[in-house]
Amino acid sequence: MPSILLLNGPNLNLLGTREPHLYGTTTLNDVETVAKELAASYGAEVECLQSNHEGVLIDRIHEARGKSQAVVINPGAFTHTSVALRDALLGVGLPFIEVHITNVHARESFRHHSYLSDKAAAVIIGLGTFGYQVAVKHALENLVGLEERK
């Protein structure tokens, strides 16, 4: 069965309670449930992992080779700091989509640079948690080549 890996970086486990004026009240569990339901409508699955630890995310990216067809990732603060995460994504050769809940370009200047964006198949910012649905749908249709089952 085709599979998408959905990764979330540091502090995203706090979705729903962390700065709801920025991130909304949708929880990470809600995001993952919707992503899995969407993938199922394409005959695919979504595997989810959230970690506050860079090495855990990197290890899971390495494990995705041969198992997943694409990666959807919200790297959180690692967006702006992690060359290692970039290298892991490039090293496994899987297409990936970068997601950010807020418009990072409208926030503090240190959030404007991403180590991933120039290599991502797509970058989705500022759509709130709906951005995950856009990313999963795009990955399934355009990176994996599936059509939604009617």
Swiss-Prot record:
GO molecular function: 3-dehydroquinate dehydratase activity
Major enzyme class: lyase
InterPro entries documented for this protein: DHquinase_II, DHquinase_II_CS, DHquinase_II_sf
Chain sites annotated for binding substrate: 74, 80, 87, 101-102, 111
Cited PANTHER family: CATABOLIC 3-DEHYDROQUINASE (PTHR21272:SF3)
Function: Is involved in the catabolism of quinate. Allows the utilization of quinate as carbon source via the beta-ketoadipate pathway.
Protein name: Catabolic 3-dehydroquinase 2
Source organism (scientific name): Aspergillus flavus (strain ATCC 200026 / FGSC A1120 / IAM 13836 / NRRL 3357 / JCM 12722 / SRRC 167)
Gene this chain is encoded by: qutE2
